[in-house]
Amino acid sequence: MSMPATSTKTTKLATSLIDEYALLGWRAMLTEVNLSPKPGLVDRINCGAHKDMALEDFHRSALAIQGWLPRFIEFGACSAEMAPEAVLHGLRPIGMACEGDMFRATAGVNTHKGSIFSLGLLCAAIGRLLQLNQPVTPTTVCSTAASFCRGLTDRELRTNNSQLTAGQRLYQQLGLTGARGEAEAGYPLVLNHALPHYLTLLDQGLDPELALLDTLLLLMAINGDTNVASRGGEGGLRWLQREAQTLLQKGGIRTPADLDYLRQFDRECIERNLSPGGSADLLILTWFLAQI
């Protein structure tokens, strides 16, 4: 399909550098979905609480999205002189086109819609920082992404009308701001919790997969995951958070033997039809930011 125009302004960024970050985004998506076992989520073992998607759908989806990540970076660079609040409007057509390719790759299954939003924001932030010759670090990337989203929660979640979206309904009922709120705040769950936790475990010599699984548990324990709340209401969300917190308090995932706890947690999530997709999206960002 034809790609939407990004900007008439040229960028000084090397194609190889753009492709390097896009490749990291693709690897982040694959790393997350291949990670196993994950409670309630699609992985190499089963489809979790999802009856409409499989591992191969995520592989096809990630490949389709990878082709669009350079466009997010390029737009971030080309719009570097724009006010940050104006950038999101220009990113939307790219995101919608990327989403269309995702749905075509998966025959209509929503595998990575949340990641298109979050990775698209981070890639645009990276492009802006590179164009302005500013350091690209997890902190600068997240703060730049936050500047793109200033006022987003007010605009999109606090609107009162008779046709509430799922996000608006969960915000009004439970105060959950979901992906929008986390982005507008600069991804504090990732920057202040998941990323340092993951890096500390790696520094301690823990196997990278076990470290990621333990980090996923941490995110599940602290994230007000709208994916979980939309399936199980407030009760389902609180149950999942408590279970994750209990496993962490028992020592978390430190050895292969601890995977039995995750397998049991997975069975219980499937029985309750709960899938922590929002936490999975944040895990993708955690791995991505750990590489830069």
Swiss-Prot record:
InterPro entries found in the cross-reference section: CitG, TriPribosyl-deP-CoA_syn_CitG
Top-level EC class: transferase
GO molecular function per UniProt: ATP binding; triphosphoribosyl-dephospho-CoA synthase activity
Key words, A-Z: ATP-binding, Nucleotide-binding, Transferase
Gene Ontology terms describing biological process: prosthetic group biosynthetic process
Family per similarity comment: Belongs to the CitG/MdcB family.
PANTHER family noted in UniProt: 2-(5''-TRIPHOSPHORIBOSYL)-3'-DEPHOSPHOCOENZYME-A SYNTHASE, TRIPHOSPHORIBOSYL-DEPHOSPHO-COA SYNTHASE
Stored NCBIfam families: citrate_citG (TIGR03125), PRK10096.1 (NF007503)
Name under which the protein is recorded: 2-(5''-triphosphoribosyl)-3'-dephosphocoenzyme-A synthase
Organism (species): Escherichia coli O139:H28 (strain E24377A / ETEC)
